[in-house]
């Protein structure tokens, strides 16, 4: 029987190690990936929500790699696996800043992973988005670049 604390099918393609090492890291992890955050959600809001499930050791906000501004994800690390499992059960799919957030297991934060991996610096999922999402910067970044008005006055 599947529970909300089971591993999802997502695997970090940049993980340094074998598939079995990654699986083991995920099964032992106390770190969660939190996605679909508003760009305006604060670390304090995240802490308030996730601390309801246990003592939060650290929160690492996801940043646009060029602008160093929040880009809609973070990592939340707990002191124990049981606390992280409680967050997987009770926080995944809840609303924060009017958005349904996604929570998934993470193999553990490593410096550099706090930056978006998209070509424009943010998350890949925001580059090709064609819908308008005020909480995630408007239209997708690549679409915004195509429709941006010419400011050269030529």
Swiss-Prot record:
A Pfam family assignment: RRM_1
GO annotation, cellular component aspect: nuclear cap binding complex; nucleus; presynaptic cytosol
Primary localisation category: nucleus
GO function term, MF aspect, one: RNA cap binding
Keyword RNA-binding: yes
Gene Ontology biological-process annotations: mRNA cis splicing, via spliceosome; negative regulation of viral genome replication; primary miRNA processing; regulatory ncRNA-mediated post-transcriptional gene silencing; siRNA processing
SMART domains the UniProt entry points to: RRM
InterPro entries: NCBP2 (IPR027157), NCBP2_RRM (IPR034148), Nucleotide-bd_a/b_plait_sf (IPR012677), RBD_domain_sf (IPR035979), RRM_dom (IPR000504)
Compositional bias per record (Basic and acidic residues), positions renumbered to this chain: 9-23
Transmembrane segments: none
Keyword presence, Nucleus: yes
Binding site for mRNA: 10, 33, 102-106, 113-117, 123-124
Annotated stretches, region: Disordered: 1-23
RRM domain sequence ranges: 30-108
Subcellular locations according to the entry: Nucleus
Keyword tags: mRNA processing, mRNA splicing, Nucleus, RNA-binding, RNA-mediated gene silencing
Self-association state and partner proteins as the record states: Component of the nuclear cap-binding complex (CBC), a heterodimer composed of Cbp80 and Cbp20 that interacts with m7GpppG-capped RNA. Interacts with Ars2.
Record function comment: Component of the cap-binding complex (CBC), which binds co-transcriptionally to the 5' cap of pre-mRNAs and is involved in various processes such as pre-mRNA splicing and RNA-mediated gene silencing (RNAi). The CBC complex is involved in miRNA-mediated RNA interference via its interaction with Ars2 and is required for primary microRNAs (miRNAs) processing. Also involved in innate immunity via the short interfering RNAs (siRNAs) processing machinery by restricting the viral RNA production.
UniProt record similarity statement: Belongs to the RRM NCBP2 family.
Name of this protein: Nuclear cap-binding protein subunit 2
Originating species: Drosophila ananassae (Fruit fly)
Gene name of this polypeptide: Cbp20
